[in-house]
Amino acid sequence: MILIPARLASTRFPRKIVQEILGIPMIVRVAKRAMEVDSTVVASDSLEVVEICRHHGIEAILTSKDHASGTDRIAEAARILELPPHEVILNVQGDEPFLEPEVIASLKEKMQEASLGDSPPFMASAYKKVSQEEASDPNLVKVVLDNHSCALYFSRSPIPFWRDCTESTPLFYRGHLGLYAYTGSSLQAFCALPSSPLEEIEKLEQLRALSHGHKILMIEVETRSFGIDTPQDLNRALKIFGDS
């Protein structure tokens, strides 16, 4: 099951999820791609968004306006839908219209496989390799991993710090994608955790899981996806869709 949180009043770019890209609302483009992988439901605090989705043949449900995060929103949706504790649930962000179905499918398969192991992760997510220039953008979250491909830390700052690098050192960073996989039970458990100081400092809710000692398994993917966080990002998206 894929759940897409869709808050209409985004702080940085209000109403971005209903902005049209070549005549199609962004949230519809995201959901249509997700539907190529699994059953998909949009969870929104806005009746307008719900009606837009349903008009385009996408299942959508109305959720509370009081949620602090998209994860809290999809947790409510999972309860409304009565999803079982063992079911793998993917959280796909409603502002990533370029996220390829193959990437979503890869994370789903990895979480399904890992959840059957001896030491299943609490949740899973994905990253792509990015350049030093890309890593300097605080809107692009970076992640560093342990030797078992689990996240050690996420930050808006460029991490790791390459102390002894030279001009010839091939620097690279891991850019986090806004894509998560849980089981039904781990999703509800995550939302029951108290927030952590690091989460509040970085404004990154995934740090809540790490702060409480939970594992986040990471997979590397190749993608051209990026989040639409500003009007400038939307202009970039319009150009890419126009050229494709």
UniProtKB/Swiss-Prot annotation:
EC number annotated for this UniProt entry: 2.7.7.38
UniProt GO BP: CMP-keto-3-deoxy-D-manno-octulosonic acid biosynthetic process; lipopolysaccharide biosynthetic process
Catalysed reactions, semicolon-separated: 3-deoxy-alpha-D-manno-oct-2-ulosonate + CTP = CMP-3-deoxy-beta-D-manno-octulosonate + diphosphate
Pathway: Nucleotide-sugar biosynthesis; CMP-3-deoxy-D-manno-octulosonate biosynthesis; CMP-3-deoxy-D-manno-octulosonate from 3-deoxy-D-manno-octulosonate and CTP: step 1/1; Bacterial outer membrane biogenesis; lipopolysaccharide biosynthesis
GO CC annotation: cytosol
One Pfam family cited in the UniProt record for this chain: CTP_transf_3
Keywords: Cytoplasm, Lipopolysaccharide biosynthesis, Nucleotidyltransferase, Transferase
Chief place where the protein resides: cytoplasm
Entry keyword annotation includes Cytoplasm: yes
Database matches in InterPro entries: Cytidylyl_trans (IPR003329), KdsB (IPR004528), Nucleotide-diphossugar_trans (IPR029044)
Record localization: Cytoplasm
Function: Activates KDO (a required 8-carbon sugar) for incorporation into bacterial lipopolysaccharide in Gram-negative bacteria.
Protein name according to UniProt: 3-deoxy-manno-octulosonate cytidylyltransferase
